[in-house]
Amino acid sequence: IQAFVPRMIASGEEGHVINTSSGDGGVSPLPYQSVYASSKAAVSCITECLAAQLQTEQTKLGASIFYPSGGLLDTGIWTTDRNRPSDLAREKPYDPVPTVADFKVAAEAAGMQLDFQDLDELARFCLQGIRDKSFVIMIGIEEAEKTLQQRAGRIGRSELPIDLAEVPQL
């Protein structure tokens, strides 16, 4: 952010910062993905702060948080362990490493019907969100709103915010 936002502001032109997060962390974390969820929660939080700062300083820049959504995304995220240095290996590695198909089966076993989202369609949706000056860009934001309200209620009652009954088991 420090590397490019000051230069964008100095240009005097309109612009937009789009940060990609995940519903896993930005909306409701999966308990077995704590590092990933934590990093995505941080992306969501810093984007919220950045957007507020850009508005407060009356710049010509906006900022949005993009949650790739609308179904399962068949991307390289499912095989990231192949890039992990051996000295940073997981203490309890998955064996075998779950695939996107494995996750879909686990979700369906938990009563969730998941479909795949076309990545080109998702990119068009994201660009439209930027044009519309939406802060949160997410397919199915209404469902996320319900989840966030439920989490807020559990937090307000000093309960665990994660609804374990809704977590797919791998």
Predicted segments — roles?
Residues 3-7:
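A structural motif corresponding to the C-terminal end of an alpha-helix
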Residues 1-2, 48:
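A short, exposed helix-loop element centered on a Lys and neighboring polar residues
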